[in-house]
Structures are given as C-alpha cells and as structure tokens.
C-alpha cells in the first residue's frame, strides 16, 4: 500500500516546510523553513519523527486531507479544531485508510503545523523539502488533488496529556539588538522604546510589515540609501517612509535600506504567528 495522503482542500495556503536550508545566502537563497520551528518540531516529536522532518504549514486553517494509509497525525501551534470524518478529535490522533481530517481556523495565531508519521517525502532541493516562494525552490503551495507521499516511520508516536497551544499575547513585546545601521537614526534605542506599532495586513513569509511610529533618520542620512548589503533573518529594515519591516524566513538575502536592529531567533516564532492588527512594541538592547 502506498504511504500517502490526498489533499482535498487547502484554505488560503498550505506549504510543505521543514527546518529550512540555511547557509545558502551566498547563492541568493534565503533559509526558508517553518516560521514557527518549535511548533513543527513538537508536532514531529508527537508522531515519532525527527524534529526536522517535513510537515505542513497551514495558514488560517481550511486543510482537508484523506489518508491513503494508516498514519499518526499531530497538529500544533495555535489551538486549531480538528475533525476526523466529521467528529472532533484531539491531537495527536491516528488515521486509518480512507479517514478524512479537516482543520478549522486557528485561535490566537495564524499558522498551525501538521506532522504525519514518516514525514512528507517530497524531493529535497539544496538539502531541504521546504517551499521557498521567493526563490521558487521546493514544492509549490498545495492544491486540491495533490497526493503527498509519506516516508517510512522510524520512531514511536509519543502520547501527551495536555498540549499547550501557541497564543500571541494582546501586546507583542519584541526584543531587538541594535545595529548594524542604527547610526542612521536619531536616538535609535529611544525611538524603538517609545514607538508603538501594529502588525499590518501586508505581511507574509518574507516579512512582517508594521504601521505606526515612523522612525526618524539622522538629518545627514535623509534622502540617502546604502549600497545593497547582506540581510539576516530577523533584520529590522527601515525604508524611507520610516515604517519598519521585520524579515522572516523567506527574506531577500540583500537589501539597501538601513537595518536598525535584529530580532533574536527565539522571538521570531511569535512574530510569524501574529495576526494583522496585533499591537507591537520593541524592547531594544545591545549584544552581550
């Protein structure tokens, strides 16, 4: 029997993601991978997969799958209703051949993660199965009718008593380390500390766009831009209008707007989960 699941519906977007392909910036390739790596790793652990196995990143729910083989499934991230053959079920769960899994809308975040025992076994590119919509690497967004092959399970599913869902707080406090171009801004730490922003509805896997306080440049820097230079995940880039953009996993590898600071990796998963309209403040610091 072929180990696979068939996609019946997808909602706004469903992508195959693992932990990405870091280390390829010199090729112009961003790291990609799950925007909330801890949630993907937890889902994998619950079904007995290695933490970095490929799973599904589901934006705003709506995914419907039919199992073509017996498999264990875990759904992590924000609290997301899961139904098997129309009956509500708790995660992790087991699917028999022919069972249909349907996911509702997540509460408290944007993206849930679905791990299936054996992992999603699509071809790897540059060492990763992740979909990178900016570079065009990896599989395209899933569509109804797609058949996803699954690998052979190598571990034993782990039972769980209580699965604590991810929830974005009412006000998201984001740490940021100043530099490398904080000298382009008047009192950069003070501006970041005093500013107030809201997550825009124009964000995606490339970055989170913010609306609110416009960051002011030093008088001698107004009207100027930098030659393109390297960017890292978490970079807070500030275009000429002063509205910050925090780069996420699919970010471009170079850019010419000044980067006032960098958000540490541990703070990025919640940013990737923040719905439009989420209030946000920065907590600036300096590298230890």
Q: PLM ranges: what are they?
A:
Residues 1-288:
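Conserved "landmark" site that anchors the functional core of diverse proteins
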């Amino acid at each position: 029997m072929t180990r696979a699941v068939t996609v019946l519906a997808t909602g706004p977007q469903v992508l195959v993601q693992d932990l990405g392909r870091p280390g390829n910036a010199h090729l112009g390739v961003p790291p990609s991978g799950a925007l909330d790596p801890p949630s993907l790793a937890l889902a994998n652990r619950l079904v007995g997969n290695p933490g970095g196995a490929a799973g599904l990143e589901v934006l705003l729910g709506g995914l419907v799958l039919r199992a073509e083989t017996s498999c264990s499934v875990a759904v992590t991230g924000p609290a997301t209703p899961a139904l098997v053959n129309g009956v509500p079920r708790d995660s992790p769960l087991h699917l028999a051949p022919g069972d249909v899994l349907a996911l509702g809308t997540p509460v408290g975040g944007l993206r849930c993660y679905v791990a299936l025992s054996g992992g999603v076994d699509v071809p790897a590119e540059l060492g990763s199965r992740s979909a990178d919509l900016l570079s065009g690497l990896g599989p395209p967004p899933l569509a109804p009718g797609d058949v996803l092959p699954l690998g052979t399970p190598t571990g034993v599913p782990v039972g769980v008593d209580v699965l604590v869902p991810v929830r974005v707080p009412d006000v998201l406090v984001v740490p940021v380390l100043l530099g490398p171009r904080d000298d382009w801004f008047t009192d950069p730490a003070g501006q970041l500390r005093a500013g107030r922003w809201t997550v825009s509805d124009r964000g995606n896997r490339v970055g989170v766009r913010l609306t609110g306080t416009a960051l002011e440049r030093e008088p001698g820097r107004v009207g100027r831009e930098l030659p393109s230079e390297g960017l890292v995940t978490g970079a807070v880039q500030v275009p000429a209008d002063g509205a910050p953009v925090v780069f996420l996993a699919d970010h471009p590898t170079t850019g010419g707007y000044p980067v006032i600071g960098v958000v540490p990796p541990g703070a990025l998963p919640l940013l990737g989960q923040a719905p439009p309209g989420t209030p946000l403040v920065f907590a600036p610091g300096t590298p230890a």
